[in-house]
């Protein structure tokens, strides 16, 4: 077990101290109660107070949701363990006033028991304070399994499923609880009475009474309770748990790991089996909306709040929750797939909340919560500003269509037009074929040695060099027949552009600028005094210029344990051969030149074995890079060695 903690037995109290010491908006109740409240609690006793809590390990829940327009206080049990009734009672006693107190409880036996006992204690010890409990039970997975409806694509009996679902009471409370905090917290902030808040919740939010709030999750790993020191279950690299809770327990089914699109589709398809939206056509929807508007006064009277017209039947609040250690990259991909699929199903996502909101310690995975907007006041309540540290600063308003999120620039071919000058410099068709073969040999060698370069890079870098150079090579090969190799200045510019489109880390940058400078230098040298012809000497000097471009960009030189330790001696040898040939009457011996350059590249690559890296990511490792050949230098050696297979 690796965790940044002190004593496993003190993690909760020390965590609370971390929260409260870092924010003047929070106070910790003195004593061993693990209770945290708003620092302005004494000024808001004329409003309904909201208290939530449960086991720790779900942070930022629930301390992170204490603040204006959210919770008044929170009670923390041990990790994944319910707080005691006494702790909860002390929280109520600390902050509740004449307007009463609502306890927001996730539907677990321990939490229900402790909060219910605390409420009962208040009847005799705090008789002037009305205390009510609402239970959040938004998780649908275990019920679908009991109804044998999980992964069943037959939707003919949807209403029957919903009726049975509503009658079953042992659903878990998970990430949808965060939306309950926000909406009810907003109502309390507006000064609504306890009855008004309860009626609004039961009519528009309650998972068990309205079915409007549903959640389902998927886990890619378990988690480790500090006091236990080992995971509660294990998953191999190709497995995932569907429909799990937030306490490190198994899901309802262990399945093969799927791509994000399939995971999201499975979660949403199951959520929509319960969510009471209508599949009616637009005319029916309009009729329903008219009926809803006509009955709006009845709706307002039923909840006691003037809350505006009922929302459209397929408008949603979507909450995508990080269960603990899912990367932001994965979260963004899942968000994209979620929005695309909901749009495909005809839903409008009015608000999107994403982030680490209700965790299961360090579990990898996500959950998706859908709240059907049956009243537009819900949107206003979600939008209310809060200083609660766990609520995202930005509640997002997604585009209704993906196309609306794309910036389209006017297309023109001006970038091709300005390259016409580069195309004016030509070599013979035969030499163009030789150049093409050289490029192909280099690309093929990098593709064939991808794994070797990756393994080498893992020892001193981030392990992506082999894959990067393989991808660049494949992209060049894909365009190989569209490149006019008898026009070398344009050819090298084209190769640079291909690499730029993929880039692939710093190595991609260096290869791109090499070919870009080679193109520019060849053109400038071949057009001096209007000769418009490339000499042998121009080739050598232009290659030197291209190497200098890498030196300038990387601020490196020979001896720094980089690709330059192999590239510089190889290019220097080519340049020397070009100079020697310029003063000779014999034809240029390309194969012999490449043999000499290849030998220099090999010696340069081998020289890095005894070096300590001074540049690049490897430089952060210091002496740990010693006795390991630099992967960038070895890639240059591989490229030059491939040139020896030239047939022309």
Swiss-Prot record:
It catalyses: dihydroxyacetone + ATP = dihydroxyacetone phosphate + ADP + H(+); D-glyceraldehyde + ATP = D-glyceraldehyde 3-phosphate + ADP + H(+). Keywords: ATP-binding, Kinase, Lyase, Nucleotide-binding, Transferase. ATP binds at residues 462-465, 506-507, 554, 562-563, 630-632. It holds the Pfam family Dak2. It is an enzyme of class 2 (transferase). Disulfide bonds: none annotated. Residues 7-391 form the DhaK domain. Belongs to the dihydroxyacetone kinase (DAK) family. Catalyzes both the phosphorylation of dihydroxyacetone and of glyceraldehyde. This is Probable dihydroxyacetone kinase. It comes from Dictyostelium discoideum. The gene is dhak.
